[in-house]
A protein has these predicted regions:
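Positively charged n-region of N-terminal signal peptides that target proteins for export
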Residues: 1-8
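Bacterial N-terminal signal peptides
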Residues: 8-20
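Predominantly soluble domains enriched in secretory-pathway, periplasmic, or organellar proteins
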Residues: 18-378
């Protein structure tokens, strides 16, 4: 029997290519309307880019790493930042006097001209607000408007009822109403990760294929789940993530690595060991040999958080190290892969050494960060 994979806890981080060692630059959203630019070498904010359309809720890098796309909350805005000049080159809002949109994520096409997302339209009537169905949406950045919408198959009258609903909010390109998007290297197909992987035609969202993701060579499993974002690995179109599953008898949970090829549409699973209560997404070093995740066990005063280092060449857990838990937090990695970051919600980024897992510094940003993700560039 095949056991389907459910994508959850989608978080947005840029998929990094190979980068040289040395300090990089971080971009993150902050209240009330900023994108902060942080120099890794100095450990401080070196620039603040004001968003004209409101509070940043998601942030994503283009395929060529030259442009950053930001979605904002106040009026369902979209802003485009040029990385070199750190200037906003384009901004607009989708809302008007009688229509509002719940905009979830935004995955750019390879040319950086379109954003693929899911939206829900809220129409103001004379005596009520009418909430429409969740729709696949193409946003034309040059024309500053929605170019095409298509009803999502299986969507109910509200966004929450969409088939394969994934993590809420901005990070991964889909969010509530359908899970995260990945765009194929040639820009012709979209991959939507939910209870199945749905392959869509990027031009009209017609379904090309539905991939039922089964655990190979392990027939006695249930509740197979893919956690966190899909990180880039060495070859174009290759992605890797954490997965977990449980056996159907005593329900012991196991985690491991899942690799997905966007070109061949094939998955490969490698179990590693017993799964903790919760895990963040996997972050990969520039040489693609090591990956890091954060595990959480317990609750309240008994909560325990650990960094886990994974050798991607052997798919083995090689190192662990405990750090002080936060009630809410996100996890990131530096441009050279030598530092690990614990950040949000709050004003500070805690910096840890990726080899020893020892705390090295606390960066005070002077602004409360949003949960929209972190873009890391060399």
């Amino acid at each position: 029997m095949k056991h389907l994979i459910a994508l959850r806890h989608l978080i947005i981080l840029s998929c990094l290519g190979a980068v040289s060692a040395g300090a990089g630059t971080l971009f993150c959203g902050a209240y009330p309307y900023w994108v902060l630019v942080i120099d890794e070498g100095q450990g401080k904010v070196t620039d603040r880019i004001r968003m004209e359309t409101g509070l940043p809720t998601s942030i994503r890098i283009s395929h060529d790493h030259k442009t950053i796309f930001v979605t904002t909350n106040d009026r369902s805005g979209i802003e485009v930042i040029d990385v070199a000049t750190r200037k906003v080159t384009n901004h607009f809002v989708l809302n008007d006097a009688t229509h509002k949109f719940r905009l979830n994520g935004g995955a750019p096409d390879p040319d950086g001209k379109l954003l693929y997302a899911t939206t829900t339209q809220i129409t103001k009537q004379a005596d009520r607000y009418e909430i429409g169905k969740a729709k696949y949406t193409i946003i034309d950045l040059a024309q500053q408007k929605i170019g095409k919408t298509v009803d999502m198959p299986g969507a109910n009258d509200t966004a929450g009822g969409a088939e394969g609903g994934g993590a809420a909010g901005g990070g991964g390109g889909g969010g509530r109403g359908g899970g995260g998007f990945e765009v194929s290297p040639d820009g012709k197909f979209l991959y939507q990760f939910g209870s199945t992987v749905t392959v869509l035609n990027a031009a009209d969202f017609s379904v090309v294929e539905r991939i039922q993701l089964a655990q190979p060579d392990a027939p006695a499993v249930e509740n197979l789940g893919l956690g966190g974002l899909l990180e880039a690995v060495s070859d174009p179109g290759q992605r890797v993530s954490i997965f977990n599953y449980s056996d159907p008898i005593v329900h012991n949970r196991v985690f491991g690595l899942a690799r997905f090829d966007l070109n061949t549409r094939k998955f490969d699973f490698t179990p590693i060991g017993p799964a903790p209560v919760a895990m963040t997404g996997l972050h990969v070093t520039p040489d693609k040999k090591s990956g890091y995740t954060v595990s959480t066990n317990g609750t309240g005063g008994n909560k325990r958080c650990e960094f886990w280092g994974i050798d991607l060449t052997t798919s083995r857990l090689t190192r662990t190290g405990e750090f002080p838990c936060r009630t809410r937090y996100s996890f990131g990695i530096s441009a050279d892969g030598k530092k690990l970051y614990i950040y949000g919600a709050g004003y500070e980024i805690e910096v840890y050494d990726a080899v020893t897992f020892k705390h090295e510094a606390t960066w005070d940003l002077g602004n409360d960060m949003t949960g929209g993700g972190l873009v890391v560039l060399p």
